Amino acid sequence: MIKTLFVFGTRPEAIKLCPIVLHLLSRPEEFQVTVCVTAQHRAMLDQVLKVFSVVPDYDLDLMQPGQTLSQSTSRIVAALEPVILETRPDIVLVQGDTTTTFCGALAAFYQHVPVGHVEAGLRTHDLAQPFPEELNRVLTGRIASLHFAATKGAASNLTAEGVDPRAIFITGNSGIDAVLQIRDRLDLGDLPQTAYPWRDPRKKLILITAHRRESFGSGIESICRGIRRLAVRGDVQIVYPVHRNPKVAGPVQQLLENHANIYLIEPLEYVPFVELMRASHILITDSGGVQEEGPSLGKPVLVTREKTERPEAVKAGTAVLVGPDEHRIFEQASLLLDDPLEHTRRSLVHNPYGDGHASERIAAAMCSFLR
């Protein structure tokens, strides 16, 4: 019996860890599962937990308005210590690159508990992009005993840093497990008119997400100007679930509100967001998860960042780096809108991030490593 403690706190972590939680729970003779959430992102975390019917054993509820990174880091590490001492796990599983990820790994390290890092080995090799995520994942990688890399490229990053190859397992990305499970629940066809009464199925839908810290200020403003130029076309509808952070919502509202063909909506729960991705013609995003999910749904992705820790989609052709640059956004989106062959070429490439079976591979790796 392997005693496994999951630690996570945000929506992206929950999306990528819940499929693993459910898989381990389906094998009760092999795994004892404990789930601890920090609630770094309270509302959006709860939405995902509900979708996957995962009930935390520990809810630390540490989110406070206006917390600095230093404050949240110290509070999370301190709050996790008694949880680890009480549960005495054989392994602590963390995912990705959030403050909770690093704090979960650090708290486990302080108690001499091995750490398994899901989605290990992503690197931009620039600590400022993304900030603070690049440092979080580098430090988590130094602490981890088990590294679950989604791709060969991520595994190569780890070996280049001196990680023992025997501790690296190429599993695919568990986020693909999640999106394929949700996709199979959805009805076919366009978006429901009740939820999106403005939707005209004759027009091509463009989905926007942008929330990265490194894009705050001039970056978000430039992205918005590119979107505004695209909206002049009569054959598109642009939908933007706007992040609640004032540094995002402020310029977005100022530059895009009340423009024809642009629809600013509230942040979406996970299932409606997957539904919206599936109905879209193009995805324009700075999100790491959307860069992975887009290829699974056959959607070309324009990445509004100068660097990405997920180069596989760029190499495969399904994603293009356009930066927070209004001209590149407009040019690349126009190409996909005007050239059906180019759109098809970018939509049909093989998804480099996984096949929906990462959870099983992660479970098998833990069994071989810990027994």
Where would I find each of the regions flagged by the language model?
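Nucleotide-activated sugar donor-binding and catalytic core shared by glycosyltransferases
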Residues: M1-Y240, N245-R371
